[in-house]
Design a protein with these regions (language model features):
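Feature marks short, highly hydrophobic, charge-poor N-terminal signal-anchor/signal peptide-like helices
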Residues: 1-8, 53-54
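Amphipathic, small/basic residue-rich leader segments at the start of a protein or domain
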Residues: 10-14, 32-34, 44-46, 50, ...
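Membrane-helix interface "capping/anchor" motifs
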Residues: 15-29
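Alpha-helix capping/hinge segments and adjacent helical runs
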Residues: 109, 456-495
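A short core secondary-structure module
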Residues: 276-332
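Flexible, small-/acidic-enriched active-site or ligand-binding loops
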Residues: 330-356
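A glycine-rich, basic-preceded beta-loop-alpha segment at the flavin cofactor/substrate interface
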Residues: 349-384, 401-418
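Extended amphipathic alpha-helical segments enriched in small hydrophobics
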Residues: 384-451
């Protein structure tokens, strides 16, 4: 009986200490008291046991915890040796990885990883707030664009974006939502951009792509944040009005997000441009999977820059650099379109060999040479939180709307399938995903709207919202059965 009581005391004490997140010294005291209680014989009224060698061994946990309660001793005996061992096993952090880790800002994610989040900080983030102009754009041009879209025509009959859609998007400034009003753009908040993109995504994933890409990671945002005054005054108004259609070329045959393996190379040298000798870069590159590439008039290019003669004064290996190149510049080749899973948005390769460009075509000019990866990571910290999460959330909400309605009207054995447990379970998952995605989208967009660049949260949002959408689509197709796989203008799941 005494053994059972002692075990209950041990379990109760450990649970209490764990739930209270007690410090190490408290655990040492508890273990010491329990050991003393167990050896004293007080639980069963017997006399204390003799001090044999086994009784001394019982005090070892108390001694170990007591020693580990001293921070300096714990660090020298355990933390430092373990850290040194782990450091020899893990691969070294590359320069590009370090820049990615340092990019952006730390917000509520720090609270989450602290283990004791202050939920008041989360509640202090303001709710969805749109200006009158943003709300009017959402209710006006955005609604008109959605009404114009015939998704079956886009993805099946034409297999490309109709020109009237392109004209409407350009005319109404959809391509310049993030460009400031000072430079001819709409200057909308991230929250407004998220809602606008989500509404378009509910009608067509192809159409939202041509709006989303210029308003996420692309020349527009890079020029707005890092461009020279000349680049801002020349390109931003043209991008905002749709006179220039941009693409950004990062992915190649050997590299995607891993810029360290990039084989697109540029060498600083003097050359001739428009009959004049000037300092510039001779480029050779090969890119693929570039969205808007076949339609682009302005190519943003990421490459690794070398300066053998140190003409820029930054050493031989300058680093990842970003440049703006007109698509009709001599030597620039735009390849045939890819067909990514039957999608109709323009996507394709581009390449060039020994293409000379002036040094001032580098985004930000000569001084920003070698800073390209940091520039990309800073922009991605915000862009990842808006574009894909908004379209993924809209997709899930669309799945919920049509699937819940279908499950209510579709009957089997005299009952709506929505009342069958095998359908209820995936339907509940879709409902949960819709609420979770929308809450996360709205909260993250609000963070970005107030000036944060949450790199960790945005990366998690990009992955989690799209993955949850994929699962919701699977559940929706399972519930619809054969109706989901028979394509046609009435198949709302594939639109």
């Amino acid at each position: 009986m005494a053994t059972v009581v002692l075990l209950l005391l041990v379990v109760g004490a450990f649970l209490a200490l764990g739930m209270a997140r007690a410090p190490m010294w408290a655990w040492a005291v508890a273990v010491g008291l329990l050991t003393l209680l167990g050896q004293s014989g007080a639980l069963d009224g017997a006399e204390a046991a003799g001090h044999g060698i086994l009784s001394w061994f019982a005090w070892l946990p108390f001694v170990a915890l007591s020693l580990l309660s001293i921070p300096s001793l714990r660090r020298s005996l355990i933390v430092a040796p373990v850290f040194d061992k782990v450091r020899t096993i893990l691969p070294k952090v590359s320069d590009t990885e370090a820049q990615a880790l340092e990019a952006g800002t730390v917000g509520f994610d720090a609270e989450i990883f602290s283990g004791t989040p202050d939920w008041n900080k989360l509640q202090s983030i303001p709710p969805i707030q749109l200006s009158a102009e943003e709300q009017a754009f959402l209710d006006g041009p955005t609604h008109q664009l959605c009404a114009m879209i015939n998704d079956w025509q886009v993805r099946h009959s034409l297999r490309e974006i109709p020109e009237d859609i392109w004209d409407f998007v350009k005319k109404n400034g959809f391509l310049g939502m993030l460009i400031s009003k000072e430079h001819g753009g709409l200057g909308f908040s991230p929250q407004a951009q998220s809602l606008i993109l989500g509404k378009i995504a509910s009608r067509s994933p192809d159409i939202v792509t041509i709006v989303m890409v210029p308003n996420s990671l692309g020349p527009g945002e890079l020029i707005e944040k890092y461009g020279t005054d000349a680049q801002k005054h020349h390109y931003l108004p043209r991008l905002a009005k749709g006179e220039e259609v941009p693409c950004f070329s990062l992915t190649g045959p050997t590299s995607g997000s891993d810029a360290a393996t990039m084989r697109d190379i540029g060498y600083v040298m003097r050359g001739t441009y428009q009959g004049n000798e000037t300092l510039g870069v001779r480029l050779s590159w090969e890119k693929r999977y570039i969205t808007l590439g076949p339609k682009a008039t302005l190519v943003g290019l990421a490459f690794r820059l070398f300066d053998k003669d140190n003409l820029l004064g930054k050493g031989e290996d300058v680093g990842i650099t970003l440049a703006l190149i007109p698509a009709d510049h001599p030597g620039v080749n735009i390849g045939r379109r890819h067909l990514p899973s039957g999608a109709a948005f323009p996507n394709g390769p581009n390449w060039g060999s020994d293409v000379f460009i002036p040094i001032d075509w580098i985004i930000g000019g000569e001084k920003m040479a070698g800073n390209g990866w940091r520039m990309l990571m800073e922009c991605l910290s915000a862009g990842r939180a808006i574009s894909l999460p908004s379209s993924a959330t809209a997709g899930v909400k669309m799945m919920l709307r049509v699937t819940s309605a279908y499950a209510r009207v579709r009957k089997q054995f005299g009952l709506p399938v929505s009342r069958m447990e095998g359908v209820e379970e995936p339907l509940v998952r879709i409902i949960e995903t819709a609420y979770v995605n929308e809450a996360a989208r709205a909260m993250t967009a609000a963070m970005v709207s107030r000036g944060e660049r949450p790199s960790v949260i945005s990366a998690l949002m990009k992955y989690q919202t799209t993955e949850k959408m994929r699962r919701a689509v699977n559940d929706a197709m399972d519930i619809h059965g054969g109706r989901a796989i028979c394509d046609g203008p009435s198949n709302y799941l594939q639109s």
